[in-house]
């Protein structure tokens, strides 16, 4: 008999794999990956062709801690989206592939996407 928590985490892994199996980022169109934990939000631009992270922002960054962006809410998520868009623009990235991972496109994940779109990224 399997534990219900084990089944829950196993389903989460399978959801993430199902989403990511069709997404591939390149140097011209990197993958915008959003991860949320119980306390923090992490956003990364990833080039899958070379396996490198091009840029990242999170609520753990010192600049965000100094400006008070340490809580996990929708306003902070939108700000992180605009920050990653600004960094992407400085790297000459206009288009991205949005990777929501195992999370629904709702709430914090949707606000990160809206902030990135307002910042100028297209997906």
Curated annotation (Swiss-Prot):
Subunit text: Part of the 50S ribosomal subunit; part of the 5S rRNA/L5/L18/L25 subcomplex. Contacts the 5S and 23S rRNAs.
Any Gene Ontology CC annotation: cytosolic large ribosomal subunit
Residues making up the signal peptide according to the UniProt record: none
GO annotation terms (biological process): translation
Family classification: Belongs to the universal ribosomal protein uL18 family.
Name under which the protein is recorded: Large ribosomal subunit protein uL18
Keyword Ribonucleoprotein included in the entry's annotation: yes
Entry keyword set: Ribonucleoprotein, Ribosomal protein, RNA-binding, rRNA-binding
